[in-house]
Amino acid sequence: MKPAYPPLLLQMSPAYTPRPLKNLFTANQCWAHLLEEGGLRDIEVETVTKMLACGTSILGVKHYTCGNHSCPHVKYLCNTCHCRACPSCGKKATDQWITVQNNRLPDCPWQHLVFTLPDTLWPLFFYNRWLLDALFRLAADNLIYAAKRRGLRVGIFGALHTYGRRLNWHPHVHLSVTAGGLDEQGVWKNLSFHKEALRRRWMWLVRDYLLGQPLSQLTMPPPLAHILCESDWRRLILAAGGQHWHIHLSKKTKNGRKTVNYLGRYLKKPPISGSRLAHYTNGATLRFTYLDHRTQAYQQETLSQADMLFRVVQHIPEKHFRMIRYFGFLANRVCGQYLPKVYEALKMATPGPTPKLYFAPMAKAFLNVDPFRCVLCGARMVYTAAISGLTVQGLNLNAQAIAQMRYVKP
């Protein structure tokens, strides 16, 4: 079936070089071959197809004409995909999230924590991704419980990461918590956490949660294929990890900006940056460098192009899964009630609304060129029409054709 492209046809130009991540997928038609083989999740196909079509007329086009009626200049701007796996769209989403958080977070000491799982349980969460949803709640409950015992309400925001530095499957939870909280009288009091107590309770909470899941509802990964009955399941969970349930507590910081900037770099973008793929020359294999946290030395790993693609797409979250969540007085349900009290207790001015980021100011700041200024006469470009692009259903139907377009230029 021929792809049903929008009215504005694509111009194919061998002089155009796609971004490194797009090039990784389209070189040697590797992604197209993987689509033919099948076995990919629906969300992986949908997200990658959106990313490959981003910035082309496939997603639709906005038509601008010069405000000076005697000027013939016309400009077309192609729509973007707004998906998390896109390195282009991730920049705006990242900056917007960081701006919002830095504006509203209380100006007080914060502490960053990382909750990890034993590697024997990693495959279980890979084959049963719905289990990931509870990790947020279990990790946050650990901190809320410790604060509640002291009569305090803390603020927490967190993110789920599913990848390690080698892009392998390694689910873990990042949480940032205020190093203090509100008591019942609305007074702010400092708070510290005991690492070993947190570790033991984290281990108990995860084990208790997993033991509560019916074995019939779980998909057992190949390494755990021998688990056939409830007693085997219970034995596995109670023995998993031994003492290798780790929690990392960073040093307290004077505010939450450092953590916000750190998490923002990873949450709205692909798991690997384009700069780490810039050296890729369309070969059958590629080599990438990563920092080994055990040896604190840089290591190199060589992978086939297909293996690298599998490592990237496995970290695409399921549809509607929220990778960032808020708890305590930052929870969406109660933040309107408690944040004003927190600002008052910390003697902070109530922050105003966060300015929204738009394409034109960002482009002007980066390129030093106003995208809506006519290049011929200097007048303002005026929006006049739009050409609709493919819907999500249309993108999925044309995924194979889009994957085969190596060089795409609108």
Curated annotation (Swiss-Prot):
Keyword DNA-binding: yes
Record GO terms (molecular function): DNA binding; transposase activity
Entry-linked Pfam families: Y2_Tnp (PF04986), Zn_Tnp_IS91 (PF14319)
The keyword DNA-binding is annotated on this UniProt entry: yes
A biological process from GO: DNA transposition
InterPro entries for the chain: transpos_IS91, Transposase_32, Zn_Tnp
Disulfide linkage: none
Keywords: DNA recombination, DNA-binding, Transposable element, Transposition
Top-rank taxon: Bacteria
Family, per entry: Belongs to the transposase 32 family.
Main function: Involved in the transposition of the insertion sequence.
Name recorded for this polypeptide: Transposase for insertion sequence element IS801
